[in-house]
Amino acid sequence: MTAAVQSPTVNTTLNYFREVADGGLSEIRHGTVGSTRMKYNTQPVVVNDIRSNEGEFSLDKQGFQLVTSATKVKAFDEKTVKEQYYEELIDLIKETTGASFVLPMNHLVRQQLWESIHEIPADADDAAIVDTTAAPAMSVHIDQTPEGAELILQMLMQADAGRLGKTRWGIINAWRPLKLIRREPLAVCDVRSVPDSDLRVLGVIYPLPDGMVYNGSSDLKSDTWNVAANPEHKWYYASNMTPDEVLLLKMYDTKLDGRARKCPHSAFKRSYDEGPARESIETRCLVFWEDQERE
């Protein structure tokens, strides 16, 4: 079978936030059937391929950056990722950003079809548990609001949060294919094309691991951003990404000097997508520049 010829632009649709007045949600419980039933405002968009001009895009300018960085890791099980892969990412992010301290927080290995988590019986209870993290995330979002990012800092750094929080810090996601991407690639939006008026807070309730309590609760409520549709948004992706490449996305940055501080993103479908489920690993990292002022 001959592979489809890829165009420098892709006409597709993205799932934007549906306003609450139109049936959307303002809060979900992560990992439940109810969260998979969230309704969106699906809109046509054009996604531009950055191949041949990758160097024009950076974390501080558009909010994302493609870097070439082969990994020595062969197996992406929990133990190997935390003991070996995290160390590679720490070095990569320090080298790319000039950060002095990088702390990988968690990671998601995605290797299921998006359809698999949506083939749920209509009579299933909204509160029933379902794994929603193993498939591509097919909605436009930013992982943390500033308040959500501050909550993560306080939770993970605890006694050091006060000291580190006085310097410049942020959150960066590192997205790497585990195999050549043939379907549902990741789209990223130039944040300069996204006014704050397009951002919508979505509260997410996360059940904490067994035995863990935060502020007296076994649940953690944090805020993320969903994004309302706007034809002015500028969308991009890197075609045919390989395991030797990493797409860095900025989720938060304390600097208020005009640089990019966030990056809306979403997986998307193309008419010529083919093959088995996409395989990727996404790692979320706290990043600190201890030699720079917070703002």
From Swiss-Prot:
Q: What's one GO BP annotation on this UniProt entry?
A: terpenoid biosynthetic process
**One term of GO molecular function:** oxidoreductase activity
Q: Which domain of life is it from?
A: Eukaryota
Q: What class of enzyme is it?
A: oxidoreductase
Question: Which pathway does the UniProt entry assign to this protein?
Answer: Secondary metabolite biosynthesis; terpenoid biosynthesis
This molecule's function is given as: Hydroxylase/desaturase; part of the gene cluster that mediates the biosynthesis of enfumafungin, a glycosylated fernene-type triterpenoid with potent antifungal activity, mediated by its interaction with beta-1,3-glucan synthase and the fungal cell wall. The pathway begins with the terpene cyclase-glycosyl transferase fusion protein that most likely uses 2,3-oxidosqualene as substrate and catalyzes glycosylation immediately after cyclization.
Query: Which family does the record claim for this protein?
Result: Belongs to the asaB hydroxylase/desaturase family.
By what name is this protein known?
Hydroxylase/desaturase efuI
Q: Which organism is it from?
A: Hormonema carpetanum
Gene field: efuI
